[in-house]
Amino acid sequence: MAASVWSGYLTFGLISMPVRLFSGARGSRISFNQLHREDHARVKQQLVCSADGKVLERDEIVKGYEYRKGEYVIIDPEELKKIEPKTAKSMEILEFVKAEEVDPVYFETSYYLQPDEGGEKPYALLVQALKESDYMGIAKVTMHNREYTVFLRPHTSGIMLHTMYYEDEVRKMEAPKITSEVKPAEVKIAHQLIEALAGKFEPEKFHDVYEANVKKLIEAHLEGQDVEAVAKPAKPAKVVDLMDALKQSLAAMKDQKKGSRLAEVDKESTVQMTPKKPAVKERRGRKRVA
């Protein structure tokens, strides 16, 4: 099992249970190293004192808060531990809200909340109660040197915890001003188009084609080959007649196997390796003698 990122107690009312938090997802991205263009050696980043130019070791560095230009208050890590709120070790559910009332825009990072030894029964009780009531819990927890407000919601794996963006962190966006009226007939065909594209959510069928192309590019370099360029999409034509465009879209969907569009889009963007073309030598003309 993966290492937990937090452990402590979850409480609601007089009920308390030991729990652990585990990361709910992790990004998988290809990373590149920075190299010296001339000899392809790795580039090192050093910590340098701005006053005397000395290269510093990690144990020579302290944390400081700049309260005035060029002047700092030095804070020791032990001092930060001393002022940790009780939520550093205890997560109390402060209230419950209906899941439908929470806009997903407030969800930040996801974690699995699992019971620790001795907390299995109250944990199972909470999971079942949340499922049957369609409520989510709101609690507070301190980790990574910050106190988070979090959502607790039932999940097939037990309870999912989502850290919450605070109100002042969520950007507001006004709804676009719609000047033209949507006709009932247009809405009807739009519903049919949605149904034609509707399917069961299967996250395993979605992939990052760009990352796959980068891997293919690296492989091509190692094997002395090249990759063909992905054809750029044509600029979509401006929709003049919305009803006509809807009807054409629906007709195209009827001729298409359900769920096949994703495979088509991925295939159109996936690169293939090709033999590297020999470099073209420049032809040099004879010099004319005056």
Curated annotation (Swiss-Prot):
The keyword DNA repair applies. Residues 254-269 have a biased composition (Basic and acidic residues). GO terms for biological process: DNA recombination; double-strand break repair via nonhomologous end joining. The keyword DNA-binding applies. Residues 11-183 form the Ku domain. Transmembrane segments: none annotated. It comes from the Bacteria. It holds the Pfam family Ku. GO terms for molecular function: double-stranded DNA binding. Keywords: DNA damage, DNA recombination, DNA repair, DNA-binding. Belongs to the prokaryotic Ku family. Homodimer. Interacts with LigD. With LigD forms a non-homologous end joining (NHEJ) DNA repair enzyme, which repairs dsDNA breaks with reduced fidelity. Binds linear dsDNA with 5'- and 3'- overhangs but not closed circular dsDNA nor ssDNA. Recruits and stimulates the ligase activity of LigD. This is Non-homologous end joining protein Ku. It comes from Koribacter versatilis (strain Ellin345). The lineage of its organism: Bacteria, Pseudomonadati, Acidobacteriota, Terriglobia, Terriglobales.
